[in-house]
């Protein structure tokens, strides 16, 4: 998957200020870095708007005695789960894109930035999804998780029986195999859980026979948070999984870029009867 013309308006200025050739720095990396910085600046402004948990809609009313209930909306609700030290504001553009294309039941879950355990956060997600199903009358949901949010959702699906509720899990830049980036951050317990060969990562590698959820992982070839880059891929013999490589953007752009949002919508709208377990690969070029 390739995103085209991501930061073209800014590039001429960069090319004037920087040497013509910068050793070891490709044009694609330069464009992705400029975009990441622009997104970071914008997200700092939006961050306060997402601190408070969003208001929930009313519960689905029970049908009157002797009446036939109306059929539930064909498309299941979508749950958005942010990454480490972030909040629901990161999904403002994705949420708008989903709503514009018929996904009106979209909810975000804020978990505390002080969360120190992925398992605890996964239990919170499970309770949240049960509440959504009760309110909407839907049996299943789709989940989109960015970075740590994807790992929390995967733990819920794989280890807490969440495959009963989650139809499709889309992860964006999630360290499924752990990441070695920022070694000085090991003081935080949840960062240690995201390291390769951590107890939690090894737990996710255990057998998961009969898992009913379909997994789609978007991973970027310019993701500065994934070390190695392929750690954002799902490799598990028991899981029905697809890995989609995104070329040309970095970690922060994954939940915000229109081309990625379009691909997420296609993934969620695809019916997959009889999918077999095992990882599949694909690609999306965005720059």
Feature locations, PLM:
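Flexible, membrane-associating and regulatory peripheral segments of lipid-active enzymes
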Residues: 1-78, 92-93, 101, 270, ...
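Conserved serine/cysteine hydrolase catalytic core
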Residues: 54-57, 69-72, 201-217, 268, ...
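Serine-dependent carboxylesterase/thioesterase catalytic core
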Residues: 78-89, 95-212, 217-219, 225, ...
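Short alpha-helix in the alpha/beta-hydrolase fold that links the catalytic acid
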Residues: 94, 227-234
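Catalytic histidine neighborhood in serine/cysteine hydrolases
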Residues: 104-107, 237-254, 264
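Catalytic histidine-centered segment of alpha/beta-hydrolase-like enzymes
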Residues: 117-118, 249-258, 284
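Acidic beta-to-alpha connecting loop that harbors the catalytic carboxylate
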Residues: 221-224, 248-250
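Post-His helix in hydrolase/transferase enzymes
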Residues: 255-269
